[in-house]
Amino acid sequence: MFKLFKKLTKKDRLFILLCLVFIIGQVGLELQLPAYMQAITILVQTPGSELSQVLGVGGKMLLAALGSLILSVLVAVLVANVSTNFGANLREFLFDKVLSLSMEDISGFSKASLITRSTNDITQIQQFLVMGLQMIIRSPIMAFWAIMRISNKEWSWTLATIVAGIAMVSIIAISMAIAIPKFKVRQQLTDRLNLVTRENLTGIDVIRAYNAEDYQTQKFEDANIDFTNTNIFVNRVMATMHPSIFIIMNALTLAIYWIGAVLIQNTTAGNELILFSDMIVFSTYAMQVIMSLLMLIVVFAVFPQAKVSGDRVNEVLNTDSNIIEGTQTKGLEEHQGEIEFKQVDFRYPKADKNILKDITFKVRKGETLAIIGPTGSGKSSLIQLIPRFFDVSGGEILVNGRNVKDYTEEALNNAIGFVSQTAILFSGDIKENIIYGETDKKDLEEDEIQHVAEIAQASEFIEKLEDGFQSSVAQSGTNFSGGQKQRISIARAIARKPDILIFDDSFSALDFKTDRQLRTALQTELADTTKIIVAQRVGSIKDADQILVLEDGEIVGIGTHRELLETNAVYQEIAQSQLSEEELR
């Protein structure tokens, strides 16, 4: 976990140094208070003492207390600043790291776990930092100076303090040994609870459609009960520990006064006053030693939970993406817009067998390649290899004449416009969604935004909205229909002006008329752009230059619509299930 603190900025490190200086000053002033108290006690009990003497010492005591208060406030402000900045920076590091991870890495953590690590875990680390900066620095200094002040006092008082300290450490060590294993379990159960909650919220329509409310409620209750029971166990351990500590502290105070009473009773005449004042001062310093131990123990009690959180955050930050970025920023001019698969094999991580086998084809600039096949044939997996969502298991993929592994991530993404199966919109407005992301192409003007919306067949419904392109988009685009979201997503891909456009079954929510108009616009307006279309509907792809037929991860046919109708049994079966006899002729 302590590796995370290397990410503290220079400003934060300076603030921590100032905290150290202020805490030393604060402790020094606090330790003067018992000495002033002893002096006042002696003055009060000494015949002939002047009131001015008592007031003088009392004034110094008041100034010391006020100085300690001011320094403690300054320390609190600095610590709050450091912990807040550190938490914000850590979230940013974690967010940037997650964005750089491959799909394989992200699925290994799970989205619910990544959300928990970005929020709850970092909050735990912040809380530890707040406590640690104040208590870890303050406690050893306080304990050391207090022990130095009482080391020359009565040995029996010192022995009582040592016994109390050992008893306190023993109780806390036992409590921590019981509770620490549960801290990691609690974080895992937090992930589980977040996962179930997220499933319920994102799948609420399916849950209602299948009358599965009771099932999901039970699923949530099971996760919630496990989480609650673990929390109760940990809290019971802590609840037992705290009163035990205070019993020890009170017992130490009683022991000091009981020993003091015996010593005063047995001392020679004239030493009672000195012993009495020593007893008052010793009890105060002893409590400061014990409180210092207590503060350290509180930090150590929080540390295991913070360490679990820190390890979880570090696990993400230390994960090296299995997608190694290349160095090339441009393709070969003579192969611009080309895509070529050369004997590509692919299997998902931890899978037993390849789901794509010996895939070989080439698409030239401006051509349209359609990919069709039965469910589970590997269509989406194939096109996800082009932008390197996953890397091939064998063979190679060339984009613009270079292996995709040779490109920088930015350069490869700039060459490709990708429209996923699920239309993803981001909160903001329509214009922000269309011009979303960075590109090496020039910024879009208003008329260009209008134009790409027209190509995507989105301008018609956008113009009917009261605010047009400035119309608000809710989270995940929930205020738009599936077809509208798909058209905005398509406009976003076109707006990047890529060399290659990839559509992963991205016309599925469009009616036949809009589908046909969109395909026509793509052919006429983007004639020089290479297009790859994954589709389930034969009607969406029959005009493609090439149609690639997949079955069980293998190419079983490639050609035009007419050629495949005559020669390919798989394509014939798909076409016959969708087209009329007249359309098949």
Task: Please name every model-derived segment.
Residues L332-R585:
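ABC-type nucleotide-binding domain
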